């Protein structure tokens, strides 16, 4: 019996999406485990907040370089093949890091190099995967599919860090990297099990540079799309680095250790999951433009509040609020962009969104890590959260009439 369209699980009626969703959920659990373990490993190896920020930055900086050409490639290429190759490369990188840690030969520079490799792969994987979803469910269920993906992303954000915190404390960091490597197998199996129509190479108008310019022109000329992209850039640059500094807060500010770090990361996931499930359930009745306009400054305020929380339960509550606001903003922005953009430009526009969403974060991480070394992690983070709030309020004061009415 078909799933009703207004069901919060409507997109799961599509077999290919069910496969993709299952594989991604398993893989994301491993990804979150590795993210926590990697930050803790770098802090152990270097005892430096700047190094923690640097490695996080190297994991995202390649997206600044490669995202736009990767978006052109995503519009031209077989997206399933691109995602498959990228997932296999990510598996290899995680396995190598697991071996280095298990054998005691790991050094900070090796972690940094592998982070850069992963970032380069992600530059091609993200736009291909984002634009692949619409091929699995069609535009009718796209909003629901994005909300469900966000639910999986954030449910695993609860489980992954919590398990990683226990493993780091009781077994060792290498186990987290090994489990992440194995988790990519689930995605590879799901991709091969899909039943898709034969792929046909699209006819490309102009060279690669011309197609990049075409995508940028579209964004510049549509004030709604431009506002959504600029808002993402502001939050990514000034707000998102709070995640990078969680190991520093866990060890040096709140003094709760690796297990406390797992709880902190999981609390972000709890707030984010609540937002994603709410969006999936009520998506037909929500003005996504209004969600973005309100969630953005709330996120900045929550980051600033966490920076000065010294009571652990209060820190957990503010982190949950950051997760809640962040997912409302990101999921609504993602859906609006994919709805507003023509099919032939979707890969390029989503690549630009990935560039500012993921690629600007390392610049913010470097800046925040540098400031943390001078004025301390709390002051650095509070400044970023406050700046994100002020700029976001100013931006939506100008663009709210155009964006708030979007559904």
Where are these regions (language model features)?
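Alpha-helical transmembrane-bundle signature of multi-pass membrane transport and export proteins
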Residues: 1-407
């Amino acid at each position: 019996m078909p799933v009703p369209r207004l069901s919060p699980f409507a997109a799961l009626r599509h077999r290919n999406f069910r496969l993709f969703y299952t594989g991604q959920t398993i893989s994301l659990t491993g990804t979150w485990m590795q993210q926590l373990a990697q930050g803790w490993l770098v802090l152990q190896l270097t005892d430096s907040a700047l190094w923690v920020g640097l490695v996080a930055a190297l994991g995202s900086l390649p997206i600044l370089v490669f995202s736009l050409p990767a978006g052109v490639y995503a519009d031209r290429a077989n997206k399933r093949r691109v995602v498959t190759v990228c997932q296999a490369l990510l598996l290899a990188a995680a396995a190598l890091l697991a071996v280095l840690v298990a054998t005691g030969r790991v050094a900070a520079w090796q972690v940094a190099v592998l982070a850069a490799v992963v970032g380069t792969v992600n530059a091609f994987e993200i736009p291909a995967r984002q634009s692949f979803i619409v091929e699995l469910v069609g535009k009718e269920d796209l909003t629901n599919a994005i909300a469900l993906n966000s639910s999986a992303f954030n449910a695993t954000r609860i489980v992954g860090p919590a398990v990683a915190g226990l493993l780091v404390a009781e077994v060792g960091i290498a186990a987290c990297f090994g489990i992440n490597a194995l988790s990519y197998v689930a995605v590879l199996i799901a991709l091969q099990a899909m039943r898709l129509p034969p792929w046909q190479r699209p006819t490309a108008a102009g060279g690669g540079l011309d197609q990049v310019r075409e995508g940028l022109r579209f964004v510049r000329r549509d004030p709604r799309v431009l506002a959504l992209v600029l808002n993402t850039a502001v939050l990514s640059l000034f707000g998102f680095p709070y995640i990078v500094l969680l190991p520093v807060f866990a060890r040096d500010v709140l003094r709760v250790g690796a297990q406390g770090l797992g709880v902190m990361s999981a609390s972000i996931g709890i707030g984010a999951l609540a937002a994603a499930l709410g969006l999936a359930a009520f998506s037909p009745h929500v003005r996504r433009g209004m969600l973005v306009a309100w969630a953005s400054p709330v996120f900045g305020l929550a980051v600033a509040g966490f920076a000065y929380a010294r009571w652990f339960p209060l820190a957990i509550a503010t982190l949950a609020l950051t997760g809640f606001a962040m997912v409302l903003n990101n999921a609504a922005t993602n859906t609006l962009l994919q709805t507003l953009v023509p099919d032939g430009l979707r890969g390029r526009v989503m690549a630009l969104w990935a560039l500012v969403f993921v690629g600007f974060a390392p610049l913010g991480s470097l800046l925040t890590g540098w400031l943390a070394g001078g004025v301390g992690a709390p002051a650095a983070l509070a400044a970023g959260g406050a700046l994100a709030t002020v700029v976001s309020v100013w931006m939506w004061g100008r663009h709210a009439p155009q964006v708030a009415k979007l559904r």
